[in-house]
Amino acid sequence: MVVIRMARGGAKKRSFYRIVVADKRSPRDGRFIEKLGFFNPLAKGGEERLKLDVAKAEAWLAKGAQPSDRVASLIKEAKKAA
């Protein structure tokens, strides 16, 4: 099964997430099929909090990819902002 989820990056206590399409069996931060964007929960000032290619996300959802709960809410947020 293919899922759209977040892969954690960044330093300790400074999380940064890539939004990726991956096989469900792959490790959280492991192999992925395609990168769709990023999410920075600790963005300050002029830093960008969320960047997501909505067209690619919609294409993967049409192919049957299942988004995680958090990614589903981020896709809604990105659509609203666009």
UniProtKB/Swiss-Prot annotation:
InterPro entries: Ribosomal_bS16, Ribosomal_bS16_dom_sf. It holds the Pfam family Ribosomal_S16. One of its GO terms (biological process) is translation. Keywords: Ribonucleoprotein, Ribosomal protein. One of its GO terms (cellular component) is cytoplasm. Disulfide bonds: none annotated. Gene3D superfamilies: 3.30.1320.10. GO terms for molecular function: structural constituent of ribosome. HAMAP family: Ribosomal_bS16. Belongs to the bacterial ribosomal protein bS16 family. This is Small ribosomal subunit protein bS16. It comes from Francisella tularensis subsp. holarctica (strain LVS). The gene is rpsP.
